[in-house]
Each structure stands twice: as structure tokens, then as C-alpha cells.
Swiss-Prot record:
Binding positions for [4Fe-4S] cluster 2 per the UniProt entry: 184, 188, 191
Domain TRAM: 403-469
Ranges where the MTTase N-terminal domain occurs: 8-119
GO cellular component: cytosol
Official protein name in the record: Ribosomal protein uS12 methylthiotransferase RimO
InterPro entries membership: Elp3/MiaA/NifB-like_rSAM, Methylthiotransferase, Methylthiotransferase_CS, Methylthiotransferase_N, Methylthiotransferase_N_sf, NA-bd_OB-fold, Ribosomal_uS12_MeSTrfase_RimO, rSAM
Gene symbol of the encoding locus: rimO
Listed transmembrane segments: none
Keyword 4Fe-4S: yes
Organism: Saccharopolyspora erythraea (strain ATCC 11635 / DSM 40517 / JCM 4748 / NBRC 13426 / NCIMB 8594 / NRRL 2338)
Function: Catalyzes the methylthiolation of an aspartic acid residue of ribosomal protein uS12.
Protein family: Belongs to the methylthiotransferase family. RimO subfamily.
Residue numbers binding [4Fe-4S] cluster 1: 17, 53, 82
Length: 484
């Protein structure tokens, strides 16, 4: 307990992706071990730590709004995370409501910095730097360099001298994100993430396995493997097939029901990895493929690789091994130079691909990216119209794909039971964005249980399912199918 403050209560607020969730839970473990009390109620906290997102403009606005709302509680407010790392002193200057803006290099001693905030001691705002320059260009040289130079890498125990700090779960969900790696070596022209997340750095397999076993002990049934580019896992460990060998080991951990891989780079997705994900028992046949577009010309301007035909061939390869596999993607429309022909090609690709979930984003300039300086920018109203058109198409296509699953059997991980309405996800559904299963006649199935069900109806991207063997209530079935 601090001599300066008898009360050291902290609330963690997490924005953005699942990678940020992992970072927040490591920060929570750090703070708990150093005597801070973690609470959920921001209004009762002495300090609110906001783990910000700095990915796109809407996410940055959400981060600022959350920081302002935290300030309104009367607590001290500390900004961490990607937006804080990316903008640092600039954010501090424009947002005086934040009592401190801390970058990744502060994470190992966050508890001490929060003590400073409570004591009224000024903390110099984080000064951003290009984190790609902090590790060697050669991937295999990075693990040793990261250890020797004490480079802070979120989700990797921060730095070697503080490694071993326990992660602390912030909810009791049966799903837990597990970080494979941090950073990215790709240079997509529209993306700023590598500049503030740094070069790609894999976690050691034994470290990943150890954390996975701990998560299972905490009640996690599904492990959601996250990184900026999971297909690169192991390239800096002199083993480009490391993920293929890691997956069955993760799936074999006691208490783990399923392992799910996120963020696969299509151009790097090798046949061996496709087979491992599609056929390994305990690994969800689920492919989160970041296509972004399908026009080869647009992809080249994005500094990406692929084409409509190569992407369709990859999808065919997946479905030959696992016909019911879930395949999701994101696409960007209105990229500089995108012609009507490019736009039509993207829509044709989506129609032929029959994806289970599609996120549609309109292009907008991001600070510090190559694409921000491109010519051929489309008017904002044209971009908005294309977003609307592709979104409508995507909604129709994913609803058709969901309807195709009616009559099939799925394994549903129950995640919520709210006033008798039981919901969860099947193997083809990733968390939060890919739809869910509504379980009728659940028969007392509890959160964390896996239930063998038959799909009886669809409602958009969502499925209505009934446990196999449950008595059929024709009126309930009729009502469930009305929205399909």
C-alpha cells in the first residue's frame, strides 16, 4: 500500500481489438501485483486507465470521447494504448483532461506512474517514435535483440526484466484472446499500425502454451489467437511452419474446447496452414482472411498481393478440406484510383466467394501513410455510396450463406444466458462480428458449455439452433423462422 495514498483503486477501460484486451489484462496483472485494487465502477475509481485505439478516425473519436467521459467522473485519467503511443505529446496538448499520456515503454512501471498521477507529480508525455526502427530488419535477429535492448512489446510480458508478471482476466467469459505475436512487417499503403506497433515479433511457443494452460485454468474454453499477422508466426524463430505445429499442442491442453486463429494474410496462407486449421481436431475451421479488395490493380496500390482468381482458389482449397468452414473478411472501397471496373470486380468476387461475414470500410486518409499522398482520390460522397452499395450486397450474401446452414449440425459454445435467452457461437463464428447462435430449448445449458445443435432457422447472419435430441416445439420453431 502506498504511503502517500490509502486508496489506490483503478478501473481499466478497453477500446479496439482483441489485442488491446490482452494488453489490458497484462496491465491489470501488473497493477494488481503492485497493490492496486481493480474495480469495474469508473465513478468509484481513483484512476481510470483508458486503453485507446488509434486505428481509424472513428476509433480515435471513440477514444477521445471515452477519455472525456472518464474525466467527468472526477477520477484521474490516464491514456495508454495505440492512440496514446501514436500521438503522445500531441494528444496530451489537445486533451488536457487526460492527466497522463503513456506509451508502451511505460507499461512495465505503470503502477509507479499511476502513483505519480495520484500524487500530482507531472509526467512528461510520451514522445512517439517509429517503432519499426527499434528492432533489426532481419526477423531472426529480433528475439535476441528485443531481450538485450529491453524493448517493450505489449503482450510479451513487456520487457525481459518484468516478464513473469501475471495476466489478470477482466471478465469471466469462456472466450479468451491469446497473443501470438506483435507488430507487422508488411507495408500496406493505407495502414499506419506498423509505425506504432513495431516490427513483427513472435512469442516463443512455450510462452504461448504456458499462458494458454493458465487461461484454461481460469475457465477459458475457446482460445482466440490474435496478432497483426498470424501467418507470419515463427518466421523470426527460424520456423515458418511454427503455427502448424503449435495448433495441435494448444488444442490438446486440458480444458480447452476449441482454438481459433485470427488475421490471416491471404498471400501468406500456405497449404500446410490451411490443412492444419481445417482438419486439426480442436481447432475451429475458421479463416479470417484479410482480402481488402480483389482487383489486382487496387491491391498493388495497397502494396498487397493477390487477385480475384487467386483468392477464389484459396477459398476453394479451404472448402475442399472443410466444406462448412467459416470464412470472413474485410474490404476497403473507394481506395484512391478505384475505378468502376475495379468496384464491379470486387462485387463479383464477393458474390462468388460466399463468405460468412464481411466488414465493409470506406477509404479515408490515415496520418503518415503512403496512400494519404496518392492521387486519384474519390469524392467523399462517391466513397459513401460505394460503402452503402457493397454493405447491402454483403448483408444479402452473408444472410444467404447463413440460410444455407439450416438443417446442418453445429457445436455451440454458450456465452450468455440472459433471462432464459441462451446465445453462443458455432465454430464458423468469430467473436462479436460474425453473428451468433440463439439456442432454443436449451435445457439448462450453462455458460461455458458446448452444445451439439441443429440449425433450424436463420435471421440475417445469426442462426437459430436447437440441441440435438431436444423435443421440438412447433410453435417456437415457427416463431424462430419468421425472421429468416
Amino acid at each position: 500500500m502506498s504511503a502517500e495514498h490509502s486508496s489506490r483503486r483503478v478501473a481499466m477501460v478497453t477500446l479496439g481489438c482483441a489485442r488491446n484486451e490482452v494488453d489490458s489484462e497484462e496491465l491489470a496483472g501488473n497493477l494488481h501485483q503492485r497493490g492496486w485494487d481493480l474495480i469495474d465502477d469508473e465513478s468509484s475509481a481513483d484512476v481510470v486507465v483508458v486503453n485507446t485505439c488509434g486505428f481509424v478516425e472513428s476509433a480515435k473519436k471513440d477514444s477521445v470521447d471515452t477519455l472525456l467521459a472518464a474525466s467527468d467522473t472526477g477520477a484521474k485519467v490516464v491514456a495508454v494504448g495505440c492512440m496514446a503511443e501514436r500521438y503522445g505529446a500531441e494528444l496530451a496538448e489537445h486533451l488536457p483532461e487526460a492527466d497522463a499520456v503513456l506509451g508502451f515503454d511505460h507499461y512495465g512501471n505503470l503502477a509507479e506512474r499511476l502513483d505519480d498521477v495520484l500524487a500530482g507529480r507531472a509526467i512528461q508525455p510520451h514522445q512517439p517514435q517509429d517503432r519499426r526502427k527499434m528492432l533489426p530488419i532481419t526477423p531472426v535477429a529480433r528475439p535476441a535483440a528485443a531481450a538485450a535492448s529491453e524493448v517493450a512489446v505489449p503482450g510479451h510480458g513487456w520487457v525481459p526484466s518484468t516478464r513473469g508478471i501475471a495476466r489478470r482476466r477482466l471478465d469471466d467469459s469462456p472466450l479468451a484472446a491469446l497473443k501470438l505475436a506483435s507488430g507487422c512487417d508488411r507495408r500496406c499503403s493505407f495502414c499506419a499500425i506498423p509505425s506504432f506497433r513495431g516490427s513483427f515479433l513472435s512469442r516463443q511457443p512455450e510462452e504461448v502454451l504456458g499462458e494458454a494452460a493458465w487461461l484454461a485454468e481460469q475457465g477459458a474454453k475457446e482460445l482466440f489467437l490474435v496478432s497483426e499477422n498470424s501467418t507470419s508466426y515463427g518466421k523470426d524463430l527460424s520456423d515458418p511452419r511454427a503455427l502448424e505445429t503449435l495448433l495441435p499442442r494448444l488444442a490438446g491442453i486440458d480444458g480447452v474446447d476449441r482454438v481459433r486463429v485470427s488475421y490471416l494474410q491471404p498471400a501468406e496462407t500456405r497449404p500446410g496452414l490451411v490443412r492444419a486449421i481445417a482438419t486439426t481436431p480442436g481447432v475451429a475451421p475458421y479463416f479470417d482472411l484479410s482480402f481488402q479488395h480483389s482487383s489486382e490493380k487496387v491491391l498493388r496500390r495497397m502494396r498487397r498481393f493477390g487477385s480475384t482468381e487467386s483468392f477464389l482458389a484459396l477459398i476453394e482449397q479451404i472448402r475442399e478440406l472443410a466444406p462448412e468452414a467459416g470464412i470472413r473478411s474485410n474490404v476497403i472501397v473507394g481506395f484512391p484510383g478505384e475505378t468502376e471496373e475495379d468496384f464491379e470486380e470486387l462485387q463479383d468476387f464477393l458474390t462468388r466467394a460466399r463468405l460468412d461475414a464481411v466488414g465493409v470500410f470506406g477509404y479515408s486518409d490515415e496520418d503518415g501513410t503512403e496512400a494519404a499522398g496518392f492521387d486519384g482520390k474519390l469524392d467523399a460522397d462517391v466513397v459513401a455510396a460505394r460503402v452503402e452499395q457493397v454493405s447491402a450486397l454483403a448483408d444479402e450474401l452473408v444472410a444467404q450463406r447463413a440460410e444455407d446452414r439450416v438443417g446442418t449440425e453445429v457445436r455451440v459454445l454458450v456465452e450468455r444466458d440472459e433471462d432464459g435467452e441462451v446465445t453462443g457461437r458455432a465454430e464458423h463464428q468469430g467473436p462479436e462480428v460474425d453473428g451468433e447462435c440463439v439456442v432454443v430449448d436449451a435445457g439448462g445449458a450453462g455458460v461455458g458449455e458446448v452444445v451439439h445443435c441443429r440449425v433450424i432457422a436463420s435471421e440475417g447472419v445469426d442462426l437459430v439452433v436447437r440441441p440435438v435430441g431436444a423435443a421440438q416445439d412447433s410453435s417456437q420453431l415457427r416463431g424462430a423462422g419468421e425472421g429468416s
